[in-house]
């Protein structure tokens, strides 16, 4: 019998083993769709970003007007920009749901896959931050000023580090130029790390909602999950296009329609919605260094999750106490997101401090404690 080129060709067999003949658990739910959706988001962002970069000028005197020119005069420029801006929001929606799935179903026990995933999240956050600065509106400028200034809280080297990052004594032309360079480069780094992420995943195979070995009941990825992924894509595309075409500025800040002005500070400096939870944690601590450490810890804590797993069961499917705690954490993150968008005044300050404290308490103390308690309950 003639060899199948799909299985013998050096390049095609890699694609075959990753996307066609890959053995997958027969019972993975729609929560396993977000990985492929993230891949689609990345490809969309790289494509729209490339088209935008062709019309963008990374210069403080021209950046704002070059973006306006793209929207007004370039064929479908308005569409490309709206897809790119709102694509970032959907990228974060998908990654948050993907991480939530990992937490709920104990996927973090594949440590290498989990750690590369956390690195991907950090890289994505960096990419989104530098990208937000590029239109050079008021919130772009002041967001860049406030967030880069946080590095000055690092003892001894802080101020030097900030001036080195700025390329001067304030956020100015060199800052914009390097941020554009980074924003162009990082998505390709994300694509590279994604391949590493998948390589580690395919070493162990996918987890499943029961958290048990699925070796005895595997099905080929194609056609089952390839079609399921396409269904997931169409379901995501509907709200995405609705947002991008009907209310493209819903999630943006009106302040960014004003060109950057170092002499006028906006009344409320706040990042895009997907950073608000971390911003709320940063603001909840009155000390600058303490706030920066809490901000870093709010995301870096994900690296600790595999070590805080004390339950004898992998997933939360049959652990009602842990489930309650998980949804409490979700509610807590929504409260933090809301607080991050509010001004620093009573009662928002105390609510933010309580929510920040409970965020770390749930992850560091309550999850391991409840896991141990559930183990004990299994004996009775």
Swiss-Prot record:
The transmembrane residues are: 34-54, 78-99, 114-134, 179-199, 227-247, 289-309, 321-341, 348-368
The record ties this protein, via SUPFAM superfamilies, to: a domain/subunit of cytochrome bc1 complex (Ubiquinol-cytochrome c reductase), Transmembrane di-heme cytochromes
Q: Where does heme b b562 bind?
A: 84, 183
Q: What is this protein called?
A: Cytochrome b
Cofactor(s) the protein needs: heme b
Task: Give its localization.
Answer: Mitochondrion inner membrane
Transport listed as a keyword: yes
Q: Which lineage ranks, top first, belong to the organism behind this chain?
A: Eukaryota, Metazoa, Chordata, Craniata, Vertebrata
Q: What is its main location?
A: mitochondrion
Which InterPro entries does its entry note? Cyt_b/b6_C, Cyt_b/b6_C_sf, Cyt_b/b6_N, Cytb/b6-like_sf, Cytochrome_b, Cytochrome_b_C_euk/bac, Cytochrome_b_N_euk/bac, Di-haem_cyt_TM
Q: Which UniProt keywords apply?
A: Electron transport, Heme, Iron, Membrane, Metal-binding, Mitochondrion, Mitochondrion inner membrane, Respiratory chain, Transmembrane, Transmembrane helix, Transport, Ubiquinone
- Topology relative to the membrane, per the entry? Multi-pass membrane protein
Task: Give additional notes from the record.
Answer: Heme 1 (or BL or b562) is low-potential and absorbs at about 562 nm, and heme 2 (or BH or b566) is high-potential and absorbs at about 566 nm.
Gene Ontology molecular function, alphabetical:
heme binding; metal ion binding; ubiquinol-cytochrome-c reductase activity
């Amino acid at each position: 019998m003639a060899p199948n080129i799909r299985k013998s060709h050096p390049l095609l067999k890699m694609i075959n083993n990753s996307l066609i003949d890959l053995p997958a658990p027969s019972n993975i739910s729609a929560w396993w769709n977000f990985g492929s959706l993230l891949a689609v988001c990345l490809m969309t962002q790289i494509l729209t970003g490339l088209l935008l970069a062709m019309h963008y000028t990374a210069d403080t005197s021209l950046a704002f007007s070059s973006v306006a020119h793209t929207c007004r005069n370039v064929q479908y420029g308005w569409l490309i920009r709206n897809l790119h801006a709102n694509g970032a929001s959907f990228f974060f929606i998908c990654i948050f749901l993907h991480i939530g799935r990992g937490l709920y179903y104990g996927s973090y026990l594949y440590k290498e896959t989990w750690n590369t995933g956390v690195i991907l999240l950090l890289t994505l956050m960096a990419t989104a931050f530098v990208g937000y600065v590029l239109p050079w509106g008021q919130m772009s400028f002041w967001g860049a000023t406030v967030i880069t200034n946080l590095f000055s809280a690092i003892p001894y080297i802080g101020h030097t580090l900030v001036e080195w990052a700025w390329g001067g004594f304030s956020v100015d032309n060199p800052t914009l130029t390097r941020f554009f360079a980074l924003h162009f480069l990082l998505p390709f780094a994300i694509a590279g790390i994604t391949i590493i992420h998948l390589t580690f995943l395919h070493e162990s195979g996918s987890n499943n909602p029961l958290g048990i070995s699925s070796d005895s009941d595997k099905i080929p990825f194609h056609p089952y999950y390839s079609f399921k992924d396409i269904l997931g894509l169409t379901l995501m595309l509907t709200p995405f296009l609705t947002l991008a075409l009907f209310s493209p500025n819903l999630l943006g800040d009106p302040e960014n329609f004003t060109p950057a002005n170092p002499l006028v500070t906006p009344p409320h400096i706040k990042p895009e919605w997907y950073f608000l939870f971390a911003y709320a944690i940063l603001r909840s601590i009155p000390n600058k260094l303490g706030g920066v450490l809490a901000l870093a810890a709010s995301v870096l804590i994900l690296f600790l999750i595999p070590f805080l797993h004390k339950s004898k069961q992998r997933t939360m499917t049959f652990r009602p106490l842990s489930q309650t705690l998980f949804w409490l954490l979700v509610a807590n993150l929504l409260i933090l997101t809301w607080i991050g968008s509010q001004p620093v005044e009573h009662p928002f300050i105390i609510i933010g401090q309580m929510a920040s404290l409970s965020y770390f308490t749930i992850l560091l103390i309550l999850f391991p404690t409840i896991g141990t308690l559930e183990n004990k309950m299994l004996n009775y």
